[in-house]
Swiss-Prot record:
Taxonomic lineage from the root: Eukaryota, Metazoa, Chordata, Craniata, Vertebrata
PANTHER family according to UniProt: PROTEIN PTGES3L-RELATED (PTHR22932:SF4), TELOMERASE-BINDING PROTEIN P23 HSP90 CO-CHAPERONE (PTHR22932)
Gene behind the chain: PTGES3L
Highest taxon above the source species: Eukaryota
Official protein name in the record: Putative protein PTGES3L
Any one Gene Ontology molecular-function term assigned to this protein's record: protein-folding chaperone binding
Region listing for Disordered, in residue ranges: 142-166
Domain CS: 46-154
GO biological process, alphabetically ordered: chaperone-mediated protein complex assembly; protein folding
Biological source species: Homo sapiens (Human)
Stretches with biased composition (Acidic residues): 151-166
Family per similarity comment: Belongs to the p23/wos2 family.
One GO cellular component term noted in the UniProt record for this chain: cytosol
SUPFAM superfamilies xrefs: HSP20-like chaperones (SSF49764)
Length: 166
């Protein structure tokens, strides 16, 4: 499984590594294009790799789900990302996702990774619950009595100073 961010250079691509920021993603909606890959033969059928995406506050992740992949090629450009490889059976997998493209329908091989999904609106409610929890803790910890007068401390220190000076 490969997880690729959409603002990294090919020099930064490593198996299982992720980079990217949502503001760099620039996707209106993902689109797919099944253009013929230059090295593909007519005898072998090409398929799309199952692709998952999810986002975080600073990153957008794309995972191309392929086990035992070989001949992995990733092309990242300003307007698209192209992923191709061969699986263990020798079947060529090819995905091309263009950015800023208008999409009429969602490709069947692209789906949301709900295991990593976060509801950003729900996070605000959760943070508010944490703030309320801390406010309750502070109420429990705070004392409702007035602080001690400490008049005795001043008297003792003065008498101790007087005794040493005599």
């Amino acid at each position: 499984m490969f997880s690729l961010p959409l603002n990294c250079s090919p020099d930064h691509i490593r198996r299982g590594s992720c980079w990217g920021r949502p503001q760099d993603l620039k996707i209106a909606a993902p689109a797919w294009n099944s253009k013929c890959h230059p090295g593909a033969g007519a005898a072998m059928a090409r398929q799309h790799a199952r692709t998952l995406w999810y986002d975080r506050p600073r990153y957008v992740f794309m995972e191309f789900c392929v086990e035992d992949s070989t001949d992995v090629h990733v092309l990242i450009e300003d307007h698209r990302i192209v992923f191709s490889c061969k699986n263990a059976d020798g079947v060529e997998l090819y995905n091309e996702i263009e950015f800023y493209a208008k999409v009429n329908s969602k490709p069947v091989w692209l789906s949301v990774d709900f295991d990593n999904w976060r509801d950003w609106e729900g996070d605000e409610e959760m943070e508010l619950a944490h703030v309320e929890h801390y406010a309750e803790l502070l109420k429990k910890v705070s004392t409702k009595r007035p602080p001690p007068a400490m008049d005795d401390l001043d008297d003792d220190s003065d008498s101790a100073d007087d005794a040493t000076s005599n």
